[in-house]
């Protein structure tokens, strides 16, 4: 697990098992397996800010069932540019009643800890929220990357380049100098 600390511009790296809890989560609310979901990857990433937003939402709402969080860009399933590839998005509440999904959406919006909470009319059977960061360079929320940048969006770029056959030598989230 690569956990990017936005506040310190650095990664913490964890070697965890599927049954372990994700770093920094409260109340045993998210295992590595749950975060990974249907992804086949053994390398995952997210941010501390995303986990903090999850914790606030979890504290307010209670247990949050979710099916989709992390995906690698080459696994697809979420379009060309998705915050799921950044490990900062959750599709939640598929098994909740409409009333409970509405409540989750209201809480996620009211807490103001997420960068984006998708309107309910776009996701009628789930609730999507994400914790993107940086100044968006496109509608999907991806920032413009420059040499010297570090973070999960650099990991996505490295991952995409590797998937296209370009050898970036590393999957480390560091664009270099």
Q: Which residue stretches match the model-derived regions?
A:
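Extracytoplasmic cell-surface/polysaccharide-interacting catalytic and binding patches
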Residues: 1-60, 108, 122, 132-139, ...
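Catalytic cores and adjacent binding grooves of peptidoglycan-active enzymes
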Residues: 2-4, 80-89, 94-165, 173
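Short, flexible coil/linker segments at or flanking structured domains
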Residues: 23, 54, 78-81, 117
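Short linear motifs at secondary-structure transitions and domain/linker junctions
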Residues: 41-44, 65-72, 92-95, 101-107
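Extended, low-complexity, intrinsically disordered C-terminal regulatory tails
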Residues: 48-79
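Surface-exposed patches in mature extracellular/periplasmic domains of secreted proteins
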Residues: 62-70, 115-121, 170-172
């Amino acid at each position: 697990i690569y956990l990017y600390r936005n506040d310190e511009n650095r990664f913490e790296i964890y070697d965890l098992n599927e049954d372990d809890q994700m770093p920094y989560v409260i109340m045993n609310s998210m295992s590595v397996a749950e975060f990974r979901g249907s992804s086949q990857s053994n390398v995952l990433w997210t941010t501390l800010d995303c986990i903090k937003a999850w914790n606030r939402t979890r504290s307010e709402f209670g247990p949050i069932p979710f099916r989709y969080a992390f995906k690698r860009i080459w696994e697809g399933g979420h379009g060309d540019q998705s915050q799921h590839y950044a490990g900062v998005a959750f599709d939640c509440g598929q098994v909740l009643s409409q009333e409970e999904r509405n409540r989750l959406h209201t809480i996620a919006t009211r807490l103001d800890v997420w960068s984006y909470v998708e309107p309910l009319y776009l996701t009628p059977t789930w609730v999507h929220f994400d914790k993107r960061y940086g100044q968006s360079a496109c509608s999907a929320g991806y920032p413009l990357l420059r040499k010297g940048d570090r973070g999960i969006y650099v990991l996505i770029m490295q991952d995409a380049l590797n998937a296209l056959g370009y050898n970036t030598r590393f999957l480390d989230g560091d664009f270099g100098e």
